[in-house]
């Protein structure tokens, strides 16, 4: 159900995917055949209508587009499932169906901010951080210098979760999902931008919910930063794990590019083992919704010295030769072999292509795969099954050798 607004380019609009489609894919046996045991779904809460924001290329000449809420990160409700995805019944059907097939469902949860159309903004306008800094400048995208207060955009108020009453209300909303949706855990958006006050309240409530449901929910966070910052959220009072983006970046550098720096990858892997433990459960990704597709980096379709979001808007990025497939298979082998939880971004199992967001969110292709795509999918499945069946890959010692 796309937003009918000509200022939104097609790639930044809704494409029609819904929870029923995820359930159908699960029931068709796709994830089981791939060797996966958990599905992480995008944020499903009711999102804003209409066109918002504006992206322009740096020269402000070739491309500009506003956006729909296709990504799910503009919530206007804390508990209602977006009607475009099928509403609450579709969410329950998905979790019930997943459990019937022995699979788990992780919900992408947005706790840091809301959309300005969220009812909270009328009821409690004082629950946000300040949009303007004391010097009069906008406090937007100040990811590190004002990480607990910065707004993502002017229409996305950041909640002041250091205030106990705000943290109490928002952690209640998150805990509601644990009690009423059937999910098995959370992927928490923008973890480092949220106060520990919230994380400790939420984790305490999830532990209380466990006493009622008998289910322990898994929590994995999203934090870009140093191992010390990432690790500061890992404790019995907060999260179970975070994604290891530092490791992914070094894996891209070593595997995707000619003359890759394997020494850097080894050093970063050893740093992760030192910081998080020899048998940690950090998330090791093949890609995600904030990065250009690995395959398009690996086969040279993308110019790393140019804006890869702009390239996604303006180029018809397709496969360039076979090396991207081979390098994706190498990345899969690596991530399935090191400590941590392998996390396959949809489409990477067939070495899908694309620039940065939104070009990295193309419609999933299940049919009419070429031979290299089929081989990559079979490779992914074989490694996933090895990972879950071989004790050496689950609990063995880790050592690195550069030949």
Task: Label the model's feature ranges.
Residues 189, 278-321, 359:
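Active-site clefts of carbohydrate-active enzymes
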Residues 113, 172-175, 179-285, 334-337, ...:
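Active-site-proximal helices and loops of the catalytic beta/alpha 8
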Residues 4, 8-11, 79-80, 307-320, ...:
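Short, basic, glycine/proline-bearing loop/turn elements
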Residues 1-181, 201-212, 228-230:
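Substrate-binding/active-site clefts of carbohydrate-active enzymes
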């Amino acid at each position: 159900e796309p937003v009918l607004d000509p200022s939104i380019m097609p790639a930044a609009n809704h494409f029609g995917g819904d929870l029923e489609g995820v359930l159908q894919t699960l029931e068709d046996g796709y994830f089981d055949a791939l060797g996966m045991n958990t599905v992480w779904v995008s944020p499903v809460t009711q999102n804003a209508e209409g066109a918002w924001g504006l992206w322009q290329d740096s020269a402000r000449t070739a491309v500009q587009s506003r956006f729909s809420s296709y990504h799910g990160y503009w919530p206007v409700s804390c508990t209602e499932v977006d009607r475009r995805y099928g509403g609450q019944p579709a969410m329950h059907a998905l979790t019930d169906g997943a459990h019937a097939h022995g699979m788990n469902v992780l919900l992408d949860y947005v706790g840091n901010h809301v959309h300005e159309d969220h009812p909270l903004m009328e009821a409690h306008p004082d629950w946000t951080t300040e949009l303007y800094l004391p010097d009069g400048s906008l406090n937007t995208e100040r990811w590190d210098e004002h990480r607990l207060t910065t707004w993502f955009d002017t229409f996305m108020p950041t909640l002041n979760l250091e205030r106990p009453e705000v943290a109490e209300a928002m952690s209640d909303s998150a805990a509601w999902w644990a009690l009423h949706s059937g999910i098995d855990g959370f992927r928490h958006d923008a973890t480092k931008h949220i106060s520990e006050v919230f994380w400790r309240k939420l984790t305490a409530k999830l532990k209380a919910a466990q006493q009622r449901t008998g289910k322990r929910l898994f929590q994995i966070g999203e934090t870009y930063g140093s191992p010390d910052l990432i690790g500061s959220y890992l404790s019995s009072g907060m999260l179970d794990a975070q994604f290891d983006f530092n490791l992914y970046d070094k894996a891209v550098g070593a595997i995707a590019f000619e003359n890759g720096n394997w020494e850097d990858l080894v050093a970063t892997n050893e740093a992760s083992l030192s910081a998080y433990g020899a048998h940690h459960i950090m998330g090791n990704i093949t890609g995600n919704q904030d990065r250009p597709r690995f395959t398009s980096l690996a086969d040279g379709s993308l110019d790393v010295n140019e804006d890869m979001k702009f390239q996604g808007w303006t180029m018809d990025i397709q496969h360039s030769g076979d090396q991207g497939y081979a390098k994706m298979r190498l990345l899969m082998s690596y991530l399935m072999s090191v400590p941590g939880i392998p996390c396959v971004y949809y489409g990477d199992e067939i070495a899908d292509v694309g620039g940065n967001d939104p070009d990295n969110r193309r419609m999933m292709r299940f049919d009419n795969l070429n031979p290299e795509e089929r081989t990559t999918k079979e490779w992914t499945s074989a490694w996933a099954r090895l990972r879950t069946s071989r004790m050496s890959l689950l609990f063995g010692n880790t050592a690195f050798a550069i030949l």
